């Protein structure tokens, strides 16, 4: 289902889209233009259809309601904006557009830009803006020029470490609008993630990786805090919660536990004195949950965050390997205890075992044999840890 950012696209049309084979058809691009531009496009198509068979040009232009000057512009090749947009998109096989194929490199970069629009991106009818670090934005710019060589781009420095990439393409902007990207200020707009993203696991993963690169915080070793913050007008609270619940649903596909909360404090925006509120998606700090997050999803286009995340991932992997070794030591000790091995034999068996299986801790081995109530930490979740396929010593 496509959710339109532009008001005026009625519910019946959106219901019809559910049954279609294509995400974007010609009409989806046309309806992103003004009524005047749409009217001109309709007249243009009528003129082009009957021009060659019509002998009386004056009569034809009067009947259709087109000035003679406009008619001659059209004949010479200057078409209305919607028609030019469709020609450009058809040239690059973006209309009709069936789906994003992540095996296609062009589709891949377009989908990343699409995901940016829900995070550190901004969309206007004439340009696209992406925010981030210069190195990451330069990589996107290079790919844009590779697939769309005639598009102009520019990178401006906006803060000490932050830059903005401007992509000056009204046609590509219309393509994103037709896909349902929010236009302008996201705090005061209603929008949601389309069903076709949520249902496709590969698209959901790619979308999350780009969005987390934009909005996620870097996850440090000890605190393991991972969350997403969204600020919205109080009047749009339901939409903010819907959006975060959709992200929650996608994270659930990868067994990543999270919960949603909202701030009790409201803030007043300086530009219009409207009240806004913070909404948060907090990912559980549980060690296994954070490992699963970092092992499954990479933060795209956020190199400084990913470096920190990789450190945390290495730390957690090392820690979980230690837990695995404790489980082994405990299981062996329990086996010896069950089979009535004498205490004098336990130390000898441990020393022999240590030669073949490195990393088996004596403390856990000893406690597993001598202490009745002892169980290693996370032992009840050993099957869950086993699924990570950690390389143990």
Model-derived features with residue positions:
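Internal intein/HINT superfamily modules and their associated LAGLIDADG
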Residues: 1-393
């Amino acid at each position: 289902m496509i959710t339109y950012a532009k008001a005026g696209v009625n519910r019946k049309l959106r219901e019809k889209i559910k049954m279609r084979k294509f995400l974007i058809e010609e009409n989806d691009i046309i309806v992103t233009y003004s009524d005047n531009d749409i009217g001109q496009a309709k007249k243009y198509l009528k003129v082009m259809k009957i021009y060659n068979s019509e002998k009386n040009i004056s009569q034809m232009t009067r009947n259709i309601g087109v000035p003679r000057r406009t008619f001659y512009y059209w004949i010479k090749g200057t078409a209305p904006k919607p028609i030019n947009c469709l020609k450009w998109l058809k040239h690059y096989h973006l209309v009709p557009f069936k789906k994003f194929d992540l095996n296609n490199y062009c589709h891949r970069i377009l989908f990343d830009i699409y995901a940016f629009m829900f995070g550190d991106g901004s969309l206007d009818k004439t340009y696209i803006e992406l925010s981030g670090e210069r190195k990451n934005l330069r990589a996107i710019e290079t790919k844009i020029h590779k697939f769309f060589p005639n598009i102009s781009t520019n990178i401006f420095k906006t803060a000490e470490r932050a830059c903005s990439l401007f992509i000056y393409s009204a046609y590509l902007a219309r393509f994103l609008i037709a896909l349902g990207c929010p236009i302008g200020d996201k705090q005061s707009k209603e929008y949601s993630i389309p069903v076709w993203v949520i249902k496709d696991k590969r698209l959901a993963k790619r979308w999350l990786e780009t969005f987390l690169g934009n909005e996620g915080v870097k996850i440090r070793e000890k605190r393991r805090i991972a969350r997403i913050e969204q600020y919205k007008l109080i009047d749009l609270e339901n939409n903010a919660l819907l959006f975060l619940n959709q992200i929650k649903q996608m994270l659930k596909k990868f067994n990543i536990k999270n919960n949603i909360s909202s701030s009790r404090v409201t803030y007043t925006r300086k530009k219009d004195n409207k009240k806004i509120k913070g909404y948060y998606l907090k990912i559980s700090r549980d060690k296994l949950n954070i490992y699963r997050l970092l092992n499954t999803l990479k933060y795209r286009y956020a190199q400084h965050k990913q470096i920190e995340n990789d450190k945390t991932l290495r730390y957690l992997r090392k820690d979980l390997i230690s837990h695995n070794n404790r489980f082994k030591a405990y299981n062996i000790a329990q086996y010896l205890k069950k089979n009535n091995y004498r205490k004098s034999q336990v130390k000898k068996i441990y020393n022999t075992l240590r030669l073949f299986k490195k990393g088996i801790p004596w403390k856990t081995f000893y406690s597993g044999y001598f202490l009745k109530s002892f169980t290693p930490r996370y032992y009840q979740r050993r099957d869950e840890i086993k699924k990570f396929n950690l390389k143990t010593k």
